[in-house]
Amino acid sequence: MTKAIIHMAKGDIVIELFDKEAPKTVANFVKLIKEGFYDGLTFHRVIPGFVAQGGCPNGNGTGGPGYTIEDELIGNPHKHVRGALSMAHRGPNTGGSQFFIVYEPQPHLDGVHTVFGQVVEGMDIVNAIYQGEHMEGLEVIED
């Protein structure tokens, strides 16, 4: 099982990635992490009770990696529960690098955005994220 760690100033967020249910989304996320794409980027959108969103190289929600990926919704049983990691997009099949972590269940997002991971440690760190806070770095643990 693959895990990702988001290193924040206050501590680490450990995320279990859903390799089987969202293989292309996970592969893209892992690739970007290994390339250092996310290092130093911010959580540019933080809405208490909803989501903390990051992964925009422009820092305002308008940027991405220069390409898009397809949604992985069919056959993906994962829901937008507390701590879910999901791919942000501006319409179907337009995800790229921006992702969000859900603070509270958001069933209206199920079947719309690809859930590709779940926070397994550090939800207290997620709860403390503020808008504009930098990610110090991300790493992948593969086993």
Q: What do the PLM-derived regions correspond to, one by one?
A:
Residues M1-D143:
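Cyclophilin-like peptidyl-prolyl cis-trans isomerases
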